[in-house]
Amino acid sequence: RYLAEHKLSTEKVSPRKIINWFSKNEPLSGYGKMILGESHILSGDKAKGIALIKNGWISADLSKSELRFFRKKYKKYLDANDYIKRADHLAWNSDHWDLKRLIRYLPKDYELLYTARHILMTKGYGVDQAIKNVPNKFKNDAGLNYDRLKWRRKKGRLESSTEILLKIRNDKDYLVRP
């Protein structure tokens, strides 16, 4: 079913058929949600369609060309917040290639945050400068601290890893992903 969802297109299959196909089973992928959303919009249910596109955008597994295609196709439905949610999803899943492609479309503050997270994930050069460039409002971001902790642990810096663990808040609101 997952592979079948990636073959669907409203240009090849009527929106009504796509909606009927998904009525038996919910979409498995973000890609499937976006195609179902587009079908709902073409069938007149704009609110449901936009919600599905926004939801699917966050987790869709897109190649470089598909990212460009869907950005252009859905630009009137997607806003900066949707791009931020997608970047967050990609960063938490350590999908650094897709994150790198998305970074340039983020607002400047978030671009700096996710650039730092990307460099930490890939063990790239300029970690200290990238972290220094992160705006103060994101210095204590759960994802950034997670990536810093992982980076330090892999570099054998156990003392400074412990320092991060002890300074972060230990509550449900802060710990986005347990």
Features from the language model and the residues they span:
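Alpha-helical solenoid repeat scaffolds
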Residues: 1-178
